[in-house]
Amino acid sequence: MSCQAFTSADTFIPLNSDASATLPLIMHHSAAECLPVSNHATNVMSTATGLHYSVPSCHYGNQPSTYGVMAGSLTPCLYKFPDHTLSHGFPPIHQPLLAEDPTAADFKQELRRKSKLVEEPIDMDSPEIRELEKFANEFKVRRIKLGYTQTNVGEALAAVHGSEFSQTTICRFENLQLSFKNACKLKAILSKWLEEAEQVGALYNEKVGANERKRKRRTTISIAAKDALERHFGEQNKPSSQEIMRMAEELNLEKEVVRVWFCNRRQREKRVKTSLNQSLFSISKEHLECR
């Protein structure tokens, strides 16, 4: 079947010599009524009935580019409106708007699935709960042993992990007042902090112990040794190094102990003399005032 060009508003004549099966076409509605287009397109279409021009190849079947309605049937229209008559008509619809994005659909489905999930209740006798209780008690004991308060721990963690840690957080953890999920997260953080705190404490104790070892213990001198040293002091209050060594060997004492004893004895003798002189001066002054 070939295309037809219209010579009037109501009938079409075949372009070729094939005269078999002329299809009369009755336009019950004007072209302007077939499609809701703009005024400009309506004017163009209203004047198109009096024009004679060739039309591109016809579209049959279910081709989406055919327009118009056949009288009493669903046979497609035998002509196509020029493209310029539809320039102000409906804009083309993009394919993404016609079909939903599968990624977005999957996301919505996943969101609905997660919203339906209900957290299973925690068994209070489970090994996880017992381990958490044991760690909370051990943490409290070790924290107190190291000399840290809950405030100290909260401030130390806040300086590293943020302001969500405070004394209240540590208190609630030790009293098992946090949710199981938050308590498990805090357990890992507190465990690491406790290890570091104990390492620092061990280094501090080692340093203090070294300083204490440097300080010598106080030596106790027997009464007989003190009497012998007093006799030597009466003879010579500033003995030489050889004399100090000889006295240390005789009294079975260390040389440094004997040297320090003589130094202390001279200081005490000096204080006694100073105090005695001050007393004598006061007595003399009072005696003169009485006269």
Swiss-Prot record:
Changing residue 77 to A has the effect of: Increases the interaction with LHX3 and PITX1. No effect on the interaction with ELK1
What Gene3D superfamilies does this protein map onto? Answer: Homeodomain-like, lambda repressor-like DNA-binding domains
Identify its protein family.
Belongs to the POU transcription factor family. Class-1 subfamily.
The record's note on quaternary structure and interaction partners says:
Interacts with PITX1. Interacts with LHX3. Interacts with ELK1.
Question: How changing residue 75 to A affects the protein?
Answer: Increases the interaction with LHX3. No effect on the interaction with ELK1
Reading the lineage from the top rank, the first entry is Eukaryota
Q: Which Pfam families match?
A: Homeodomain, Pou
- Protein's recorded name: Pituitary-specific positive transcription factor 1
Q: Which SMART domains match?
A: HOX, POU
Query: Which Gene Ontology biological process is one annotated for this entry?
Result: negative regulation of cell population proliferation
Q: What are the POU-specific domain coordinates in residue numbering?
A: 124-198
Q: What is the effect of changing residue 230 to K?
A: In CPHD1; results in mild impairment of transactivation; has a similar DNA-binding affinity as the wild-type protein
> What cellular-component terms does GO give this entry?
chromatin; cytosol; nucleoplasm; nucleus
State what changing residue 265 to W does. In CPHD1; reduces transactivation capacity on the PRL gene; increases instability of the protein
Motif 9aaTAD: where?
A: 5-13
